[in-house]
Design a protein with these regions (language model features):
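Short, hydrophobic-biased segments on the C-terminal half of alpha helices
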Residues: 14, 45-46
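Beta-hairpin "wing" of winged helix-turn-helix
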Residues: 52-66
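Conserved segment of winged-helix/HTH DNA-binding domains
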Residues: 70-95, 106-107, 111-116
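C-terminal regulatory/oligomerization modules of transcriptional regulators
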Residues: 95-144
Length: 144
């Protein structure tokens, strides 16, 4: 899996909002804190808003905030909001692939990959990242 700049920035912006708690956070503050282009960030925040993960308010007292508690938003939710499915092969879901001959088992490889990507990204919430406390199923993968 390749994590694009857009997905990385979306997760970082969502983590900034989670760390800020309640109340609006200016886009400029997020952009400065995470060293993200404000223009690109605003586009990403728009996608997160469209997906129902972020709310916004215009004006002097406006800004962005999470639409749900940080403990209810997974890293997978954020990535899906800006990139679509977590794992695809040539833009196709693995279950829709058709291989022939000796390549037939590859379909199961791609399905297993997707299952594991989902397991990690769906188990980590924004609250986990803010707390610096990742689930055991994630930290266990890092053990030597």
């Amino acid at each position: 899996m390749r994590v694009t700049a857009k997905a990385d920035y979306a997760v970082r912006a969502a983590v900034e909002l989670a760390a800020a708690g309640e109340g609006p956070v200016k886009g400029e503050s997020i952009a400065d804190a995470q060293e993200i282009s404000l223009r690109f960030l605003e586009s990403i925040l728009g996608e997160l808003r469209h997906a129902g993960l972020v709310r916004s308010q215009r004006g002097a007292d406006g800004g962005y905030w999470l639409a749900r508690p940080a403990a209810e938003i997974s890293v997978a939710d954020v990535i899906r909001a800006v990139e679509g499915p977590l794992a695809s092969v040539r833009s196709e879901p693995p279950e829709e692939l058709a291989y022939t001959g000796s390549a037939v088992p590859l379909r199961e490889v791609w399905l297993a990959l997707r299952v594991n990507i989902r397991a990690v990204l769906e188990s980590v919430t924004l609250a986990d990242v803010v707390a610096g406390r990742l689930p055991a199923e994630v930290t266990g993968l890092l053990a030597p």
